[in-house]
């Protein structure tokens, strides 16, 4: 039987692995846990009706968005969504969209 990194049910296979540093409480590696966390986040977003959009901006624009979001006491994501919805509403009222 081959030893899988994700298989932590058979502890005898991992009894002699020496790991540096503090003993960890999570049986999964950091990379595996990050993948699980990302998958869970995507599921939570889907339930909330959210879709992922990737956006690349220059540092100046990001800093301006951060400052504005902080002054309005909201997250940058919420601020961007609000700005987009306002712009779309304005375009709809003009009959463009």
From Swiss-Prot:
Residues 1-20 have a biased composition (Basic and acidic residues). Pfam families: RHH_1. Induction: Expressed at a low level, probably partially repressed by LexA, induced by DNA damage. It comes from the Bacteria. One of its GO terms (biological process) is regulation of DNA-templated transcription. Residues 1-30 are annotated as: Disordered. NCBIfam families: PRK11675.1. This is Uncharacterized protein YbfE. The lineage of its organism: Bacteria, Pseudomonadati, Pseudomonadota, Gammaproteobacteria, Enterobacterales.
